[in-house]
From Swiss-Prot:
PTM annotation (Phosphoserine): residues: S7, S9, S73, S79
Gene source species: Homo sapiens (Human)
Alphabetized GO MF terms: DNA binding; nucleic acid binding; transcription coactivator activity
Name recorded for this polypeptide: P antigen family member 4
Keywords from the UniProt entry: Activator, Cytoplasm, DNA-binding, Mitochondrion, Nucleus, Phosphoprotein, Transcription, Transcription regulation
Length: 102
């Protein structure tokens, strides 16, 4: 029987050398074993025991409604939106060191 040997020697990053790590792995074994999954073929419309049914929604209609809502609110075209002009930076006062409150 032959075994694979894995070794690793890398620095820690703090100036100290890490000790060599040697792991023996038998053929056919992996270091990370995953539990077997239940692969049952379930047809659409069928429910698994203990799980709530999935609610199917009409995607196209929902997306179209969301797009309309976005365009209405993003541009600010509504009658309740008032135009505001940003202040002119030339007339703004700049505080110098020591001015103002501590």
């Amino acid at each position: 029987m032959s075994a694979r040997v894995r070794s690793r020697s890398r620095g820690r990053g703090d100036g100290q050398e890490a000790p060599d790590v040697v792991a023996f792995v038998a053929p056919g074994e992996s270091q990370q074993e995953e539990p077997p999954t239940d692969n049952q073929d379930i047809e659409p419309g069928q429910e698994r025991e203990g799980t709530p049914p999935i609610e199917e929604r009409k995607v196209e209609g929902d997306c179209q409604e969301m797009d309309l809502e976005k365009t209405r609110s993003e541009r600010g075209d509504g009658s309740d939106v008032k135009e505001k002009t940003p202040p002119n930076p030339k007339h703004a006062k700049t505080k110098e060191a020591g001015d103002g409150q501590p």
